[in-house]
Amino acid sequence: PSYKLHYFDLRAAGE
């Protein structure tokens, strides 16, 4: 759900 989208967002922001 939303948590998946957030996970990707955090990954992209961290990269």
Swiss-Prot record:
Classification of source organism: Eukaryota, Metazoa, Spiralia, Lophotrochozoa, Mollusca
Organism field: Asaphis dichotoma
Similarity field: Belongs to the GST superfamily. Sigma family.
Note: In A.dichotoma there are at least two isozymes of glutathione S-transferase.
Record has Transferase as a keyword: yes
Keyword NADP tagged: no
List of residues binding glutathione: Y7
Enzyme class (EC, first level): transferase
pH effect summary: Optimum pH is 8.5 with 1-chloro-2,4-dinitrobenzene as substrate.
Name of the featured protein: Glutathione S-transferase
